[in-house]
Swiss-Prot record:
Signal peptide: none
Keywords: Hydrolase, Metal-binding, Pyrimidine biosynthesis, Zinc
Field pH dependence: Optimum pH is 9.0.
Residues bound to Zn(2+) 1: 17, 19, 103, 251
InterPro entries named among the record's database cross-references: Amidohydro-rel (IPR006680), DHOdimr (IPR004721), Dihydroorotase_CS (IPR002195), Metal_Hydrolase (IPR032466)
Cofactor comment text: Binds 2 Zn(2+) ions per subunit. In vitro, shows higher activity with Co(2+), Mg(2+), Ni(2+) and Mn(2+) than with Zn(2+).
Protein name per UniProt: Dihydroorotase
Binding residue positions for substrate: 19-21, 45, 140, 223, 255, 267
Record PROSITE patterns: DIHYDROOROTASE_2
Thermal dependence of function as given in the entry: Optimum temperature is around 60 degrees Celsius.
Effect of residue 178 to A: Lack of activity
Reported effect, residue 251 to E: 4-fold increase in activity
Active site: 251
Length: 348
């Protein structure tokens, strides 16, 4: 990374966790990612979910059809794990270069996850096959038992699911996605080379007070939900330390405005337009800009065993105002930090 006083030049980053949706929403949101990122790990929680090689190939084509001319972008597809998934289908997809990884959603943990896994025992043959193949398992790390408080679900997942699973399958490569707690930050930090984490901009920039004090801010509502300040600070300290197994994963998750601003609003922040500048702001605040490029562009490829991108992007330190909304055919999208003044923007 080269840093002049007002410009950051880094290798083209990748987004290791994104929701691109489908149909009109897909066509609207893809360019915000393909413009700045070389690759993205695309979540498979469509309706119906992406559980076959054929479905992944078709979805990948729909994504590519939405990439504007001149954008150099490769979607990396994932398989949605279900209790009934055939290990042979997963292996075929991985060997043919269709599936980069597989996604474990505990049933009903987040948007469109009702088909998710009821227990890791139910998919042990699949996980054993993944361990053998060296195929990464991407984990939404929350338990979903009704009696467990929503703010405790990540920490409880580590104790009851993640650690027993990694003990049982010590060769399994695992990405603990969108970590939100001090517990998870310490667990990943103290883990071995087969355990990594993605972290979103919203969990680095905000805590639950920002979402709940002085009025509910539905566009900060995502899952896993924002936690206490102590957890936010632990995440910030982890990335500022230059820890090499944490990397950029926006979890950008668009929903139309009427689905967010509702009596029962959807979870997800559409942060693709503003994420890169948001991360830069956090690293600057932590006096850690020397680690910014590794977090965005180097750590992820190293963990996945992929080459780093050859091209570069530049971020400029100048105040700009984020647009209030982005048009959809029958509604609008409200981007993360809508209407706010931001410090860093990507040079176009």
């Amino acid at each position: 990374m080269t840093a002049q006083s007002q410009v950051l030049k880094i290798r083209r980053p990748d987004d290791w966790h994104i929701h691109l949706r489908d149909d009109d929403m897909l066509k609207t949101v893809v360019p915000y990612t393909s413009e700045f990122y070389g690759r993205a790990i695309v979540m498979p929680n469509l309706v119906p979910p992406v559980t076959t090689v054929a479905a992944a190939i078709a979805y990948r084509q729909r994504i590519m059809d939405a990439v504007p001319a001149g954008h150099d972008f490769t979607p990396l597809m994932t398989c949605y794990l279900t209790d009934s998934l055939d290990p042979a289908e997963l292996e075929r997809g991985f060997n043919e270069g269709v599936f980069t990884a597989a996604k474990l959603y505990p049933a009903n943990a987040t948007t469109n996850s009702s088909h998710g896994v009821t227990s890791t025992d139910a998919i042990m043959p699949v996980l054993e096959r993944m361990e053998k193949l060296g195929m990464p398992l991407l984990v939404h790390g929350e338990v979903t038992h009704a009696e467990i408080d929503i703010f405790d679900r990540e920490a409880r997942f580590i104790e009851t699911v993640m650690e027993p699973l990694r003990q049982r399958l010590p060769g399994l490569k695992v990405v603990f996605e969108h970590i939100t707690t001090k517990d998870a930050a310490e667990y990943v930090r103290d883990g071995n080379e087969l355990l990594a984490a993605t972290i979103t901009p919203q969990h680095l920039m905000f805590n639950r007070n920002h979402m709940l004090v002085g009025g509910i801010r539905p566009h900060l509502y995502c899952l896993p939900v924002l936690k206490r300040n102590i957890h936010q600070q632990a995440l910030r300290e982890l990335v500022a330390s230059g820890f090499s197994r944490a990397f950029l994963g926006t979890d950008s998750a668009p929903h139309a405005r009427h689905r967010k601003e509702a009596s029962c609003g959807c979870a997800g922040c559409f942060n693709a337009p503003t994420a890169l500048g948001s991360y830069a702001t956090v690293f600057e605040e932590m006096n850690a800009l020397q680690h910014f490029e590794a977090f965005c562009s180097l750590n992820g490829p190293r963990f996945y065993g992929l080459p780093v991108n050859e091209s570069y992007v530049e971020l400029v330190r100048e105040e700009t105002t984020v647009v209030d909304s982005i048009a959809l055919p029958n509604d609008t999208l409200v981007p993360f930090l809508a209407g706010e003044t931001v410090r860093w923007t990507v040079k176009k």
